[in-house]
């Protein structure tokens, strides 16, 4: 019997419940060995998929999930460093953060590191890079048609008809929003006036800053927004679930992807189980199992997966992403974003 409870950062970890009670026959030590506290910024759908896969792979696992933005979660891990409460983090760990979290994660890589695409191997010895997140727009086709628009790229988002109808998460705390800002830099020029002028114009068109990374695609599907600046994984999950009022748009000016990772929290109460789980996530079997459930490609070179919900890579216009520049200039870009955002609010 497994136990899963997803809670927000404002809640205390609930380490007892019906699922644990149902496992009362286990002794305390065995129960502790099967309990995994996962900090994650992934979507509810992603977490549901992972939970199901782990229940099959690790019978009896007791999974506690603390869900929040990447910034919130890493701050929490740092604040708990003297008495770690979590075992691992999954999602939100963008490789462009470099060694910023070296002190809170155990320097450990799974045995499957050699199956990861060469350009996405761990940059720091503690990020196990398990998935790519490619920048894309979620577009509500019904609302797009009502407005008489054909949204294909960044410049289309500046149309006055879209004023207040575009959403993106907060790049000061959300890794998916930072991913989108990074792509704007890649398209318009890293640190260039043109890039910041575009961001300024987007804010002037009343860009709505969402409270979570899932709103820019779920809110579009629900008809709250016409466009969400988001990532292909979230949109693909909608398409796989049968959404027929959403289309996935890669900006015609070009798109790029950020690689995201999972890591073992240093000194966590059950780091051995965390390592076993990460090894499964990174394994060819785990990668393909997850890809088949969510409809997106993953990171393994051993068993490539072609998604029916995504175009072939050669059908997408790609731009180069300068990870080193983004790592070195992250704080400056966020400071400039904050300055521009404040000027419009």
Protein language model features and the residues they cover:
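Early extracytoplasmic/lumenal segment of secretory-pathway proteins
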Residues: 24, 30-98
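C-terminal motif of bacterial Sec signal peptides marking the signal peptidase cleavage site
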Residues: 18-22
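Extracellular/periplasmic bilobal clamshell ligand-binding domains
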Residues: 308-345
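A ligand-binding cleft/hinge motif common to bilobed small-molecule-binding domains
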Residues: 95-100, 221, 225-245, 294
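Periplasmic-binding protein-like
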Residues: 133, 198-202, 209-210, 242-266
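Short beta-strand->loop
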Residues: 106-112, 126-128, 155, 244-256, ...
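Extracytoplasmic ligand-binding site segments that recognize negatively charged/polar headgroups
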Residues: 40-48, 71, 84-224
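Mature extracytoplasmic/periplasmic domains
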Residues: 255-256, 260, 265-321
């Amino acid at each position: 019997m497994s136990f899963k409870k997803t809670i927000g950062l404002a809640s205390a970890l609930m380490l007892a419940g019906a699922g644990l009670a149902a496992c009362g026959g286990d002794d305390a030590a065995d129960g502790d060995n099967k309990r995994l506290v996962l900090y994650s910024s992934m979507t509810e759908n992603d977490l549901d998929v992972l939970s199901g896969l782990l229940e099959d792979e690790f019978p009896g696992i007791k999974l506690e999930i603390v869900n929040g933005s990447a910034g919130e979660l890493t701050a929490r891990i740092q604040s708990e460093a003297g008495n770690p409460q979590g075992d691992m983090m999954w999602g939100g760990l963008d490789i462009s953060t470099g060694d910023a979290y070296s002190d809170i994660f155990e320097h450990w890589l799974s045995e499957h590191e050699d199956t990861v695409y060469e350009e996405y191997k761990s940059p720091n010895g503690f990020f196990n890079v398990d998935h790519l997140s490619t920048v894309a727009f979620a577009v509500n086709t019904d609302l797009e048609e009502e407005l008489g628009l054909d949204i294909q790229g960044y410049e289309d988002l500046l149309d006055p008809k879209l004023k207040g109808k575009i959403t993106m998460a907060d790049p000061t705390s959300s890794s998916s929003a930072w991913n989108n800002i990074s792509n704007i830099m890649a398209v318009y020029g890293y640190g260039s006036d043109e890039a910041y002028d575009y961001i300024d114009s987007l804010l002037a068109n009343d860009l709505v800053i969402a409270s979570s990374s899932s709103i820019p695609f779920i809110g579009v599907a629900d008809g709250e927004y016409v466009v969400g600046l988001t990532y292909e994984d979230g949109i693909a999950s909608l398409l796989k679930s049968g959404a027929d009022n959403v289309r996935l748009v890669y900006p015609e000016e070009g798109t790029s992807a950020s690689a995201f990772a999972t890591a073992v929290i240093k000194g966590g109460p059950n780091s051995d189980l965390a390592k076993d789980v990460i090894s499964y996530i990174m394994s060819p079997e785990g990668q393909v199992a997850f890809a088949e459930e969510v409809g997106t490609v993953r990171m393994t070179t051993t068993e490539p997966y072609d998604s029916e919900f995504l175009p072939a890579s050669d059908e997408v216009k790609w731009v180069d992403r300068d990870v080193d520049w983004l790592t070195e200039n992250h704080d400056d870009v966020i400071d400039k974003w904050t300055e521009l955002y404040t000027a419009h609010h």
